[in-house]
Structure formats: structure tokens, C-alpha cells
């Protein structure tokens, strides 16, 4: 009996161990299967700009990723996008993705990217591994406002030139050149208009001291305006600014630049400073001082492709909605 009972007990123990092993393996497999999902069974995805996907074979990726478009990725960043399964084409799921976008923007190309469970060809994907890659384009309204604000045409070339001029590589050289040019212009203005240097006396001549040759240096000439050279004034009683210095014979050969040279230089200087003030995009004078025909604040600098952020929106008229629900359509890519 003891001999017979020994093998029977051992067999029962081995069977119990095998059943326990199968139970543990089956439980572990069922637990692991929870993260293995058939792609076509996914009905909807809710994705956030500040979260990452799960991963098993590859590195995690952002749930929302902008990959370009006419508006660029820095102009606007949606906080959350929801994508819904709109059908199966026999290989991939087709998606419709929606979110609230500024009226100036719309979705371009969109694609949902999911990590295949075993490989990139696996019909099963890892749960939580799906993310959205999208492009952001301008709407017709956005392009219209962009043209009205002057950023699509001449401003782009000016801003590109300005950025290159004041880039870190050329900022030092550009600053030195600018200072030198401004100092040269200031010296020219001072030399032409404001300097009253001591001129050498005229050479000895038998002409009377009050002859017409030196009439503009006679005591009868009126005093020059404050800060101006004496040769820019005429004799006593002459019209201000146009004396015999311009109609008569010059006192001597080294009297300095003429009136028209100084006038031309002053005109060029005024034009340069005036156009610089009118064209610099970093001052309020770049935008028109009169109210635009379209009552809005699109012309303000708050509307800039470089001033975006999570859920940011550009300023619009109070009579128009600032955002609306935008949709993008695309397929699936397994990685």
C-alpha cells in the first residue's frame, strides 16, 4: 500500500504543479494582452499637447506634434485634439480629428501614428501609443489679414534682411557699421550747416574794403542766424537765406560747400530718417495712424507668427468669433 500510494501521491503533486504553472502563465498572458489592441477596434483618441505616448519597442513621442504648414508651428498650438475612427480601408483606419482653432488657421495634412505591437506591420498596436502629426495652414481670412497687415509682401524681405543684419554672427559688425554711418552723417550736417570756422583773410588786393568783391563780409551785412555759417547770409536788407553769397562772386576759392550741396545732403538725410521711421516694424509708426477700414486689431503686433503658444489665439474683431471647430482628415501610420 505504501509503495502504491507513493507513486500516486507523486503523480498528483506533479499534476497540481502543472496546473498551477498553466494558471500563472495564462494569467500573465491575459495581463499582457490588455495592452495589445486591434487597430480597427479603436473608436476614438483624445490627445494632449503636453503628454507623451506609451512605448514598448520604441521611444515615446509627443501625443500632438506639428510638422509644418503655411502658418508654421509657432503661430498656434491647440491644447487638445480628439480623433474619431471614420472607417477601415482594409489596411488602415481613416480618422477625423477636431479641435478649436483660431479663425485664421486650419488643419493641413494629418496622420495618426501608432506603435505596432510586434512590428510596424502588425495589425495590433500598443495601447496608448497613438499620437497625431498635423500641419497648420492659414485660412482665407488669415491670408487676407496677413496681407492687410503688410507682412506678406515688402515686410518679409525687410524683416529677413533685418534678422540677418542683427543675427548673432553679424550683430557686432552691423552695430559698428551703423554707428560709423550715423557719425559720418552727423559730421556732414555739422560741417555744412552749423560750423562757422575761422576763414583765412582774403589776400591783399587794391580793391576797396567795401567793394562788391567783399560785400558779404562788410559791416553792412546782417548777422547770420544762430548756428549757421556767415556765407549763407546775404547783405543787410536781403531776403533771409538768399544773399549775395549765392549771386555775387565768392570771397575766395576756399569758401566751402555751396548751398545746394548742403540742401541736397539735408534732403537725403531727412528722407533716410523719415523712411526708417515709417518702415521699422518694431515701432508703432509701422502701422497706419488712421483707423483701418476693417475694424479689428489684426494690425497690432500681437498677431505674429512668432507669438504663439498653447491654445493662443490672435486678436480679432469683437463682432467675429475668435475660434471655431476645425477638422482634419487623414489615415494611420504604424511605426
UniProtKB/Swiss-Prot annotation:
Its main location: endoplasmic reticulum. Residues 203-259, 300-335 are annotated as: Disordered. One of its GO terms (biological process) is regulation of store-operated calcium entry. It is a single-pass type I membrane protein. Keywords: Calcium, Calcium transport, Endoplasmic reticulum, Ion transport, Membrane, Signal, Transmembrane, Transmembrane helix, Transport. Disulfide bonds: none annotated. Residues 1-30 form the signal peptide. GO terms for cellular component: endoplasmic reticulum membrane; endoplasmic reticulum-plasma membrane contact site. It is found in: Endoplasmic reticulum membrane. The chain crosses the membrane at residues 173-193. Residues 31-172 are lumenal. InterPro entries: SARAF. Residues 237-248 have a biased composition (Low complexity). Residues 194-335 are cytoplasmic. The keyword Glycoprotein does not apply. The cytoplasmic C-terminal region mediates interaction with STIM1, while the N-terminal lumenal region mediates regulation of SOCE activity. Belongs to the SARAF family. Negative regulator of store-operated Ca(2+) entry (SOCE) involved in protecting cells from Ca(2+) overfilling. In response to cytosolic Ca(2+) elevation after endoplasmic reticulum Ca(2+) refilling, promotes a slow inactivation of STIM (STIM1 or STIM2)-dependent SOCE activity: possibly act by facilitating the deoligomerization of STIM to efficiently turn off ORAI when the endoplasmic reticulum lumen is filled with the appropriate Ca(2+) levels, and thus preventing the overload of the cell with excessive Ca(2+) ions. Interacts with STIM1; the interaction is inhibited by the interaction of STIM1 with EFHB. This is Store-operated calcium entry-associated regulatory factor. It comes from Bos taurus (Bovine). The lineage of its organism: Eukaryota, Metazoa, Chordata, Craniata, Vertebrata. The gene is SARAF.
Amino acid at each position: 500500500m505504501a509503495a502504491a500510494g507513493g507513486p500516486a501521491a507523486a503523480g498528483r503533486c506533479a499534476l497540481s504543479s502543472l496546473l498551477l504553472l498553466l494558471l500563472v502563465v495564462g494569467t500573465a498572458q491575459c495581463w499582457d494582452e490588455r495592452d495589445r489592441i486591434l487597430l480597427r477596434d479603436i473608436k476614438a483618441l483624445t490627445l494632449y499637447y503636453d503628454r507623451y505616448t506609451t512605448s514598448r519597442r520604441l521611444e515615446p513621442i509627443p501625443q500632438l506634434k506639428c510638422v509644418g504648414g503655411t502658418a508654421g508651428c509657432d503661430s498656434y498650438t491647440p491644447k487638445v485634439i480628439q480623433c474619431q475612427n471614420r472607417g477601415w480601408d482594409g489596411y488602415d483606419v481613416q480618422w477625423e480629428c477636431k479641435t478649436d482653432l483660431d479663425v485664421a488657421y486650419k488643419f493641413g495634412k494629418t496622420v495618426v501614428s501608432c506603435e505596432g505591437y510586434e512590428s510596424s506591420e502588425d495589425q495590433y498596436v500598443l495601447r496608448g501609443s497613438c499620437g497625431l502629426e498635423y500641419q497648420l495652414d492659414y485660412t482665407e481670412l488669415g491670408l487676407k489679414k496677413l496681407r492687410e497687415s503688410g507682412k506678406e509682401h515688402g515686410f518679409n524681405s525687410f524683416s529677413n534682411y533685418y534678422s540677418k543684419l542683427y543675427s548673432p554672427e553679424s550683430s557686432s559688425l552691423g552695430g559698428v557699421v551703423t554707428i560709423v554711418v550715423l557719425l559720418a552723417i552727423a559730421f556732414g550736417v555739422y560741417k555744412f550747416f552749423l560750423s562757422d570756422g575761422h576763414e583765412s583773410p582774403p589776400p591783399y588786393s587794391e580793391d576797396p574794403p567795401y567793394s562788391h568783391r567783399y560785400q558779404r563780409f562788410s559791416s553792412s551785412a546782417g548777422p547770420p542766424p544762430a548756428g549757421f555759417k556767415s556765407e549763407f547770409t546775404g547783405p543787410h536788407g536781403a531776403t533771409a537765406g538768399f544773399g549775395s553769397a549765392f549771386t555775387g562772386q565768392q570771397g575766395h576759392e576756399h569758401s566751402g560747400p555751396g548751398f545746394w550741396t548742403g540742401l541736397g545732403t539735408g534732403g537725403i538725410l531727412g528722407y533716410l530718417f523719415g523712411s526708417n521711421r515709417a518702415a521699422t516694424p518694431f515701432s508703432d509708426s509701422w502701422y497706419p495712424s488712421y483707423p483701418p477700414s476693417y475694424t479689428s486689431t489684426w494690425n497690432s503686433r500681437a498677431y505674429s507668427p512668432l507669438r504663439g503658444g498653447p491654445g493662443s489665439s490672435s486678436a480679432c474683431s469683437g463682432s467675429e468669433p475668435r475660434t471655431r471647430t476645425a477638422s482634419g482628415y487623414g489615415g494611420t501610420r504604424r511605426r
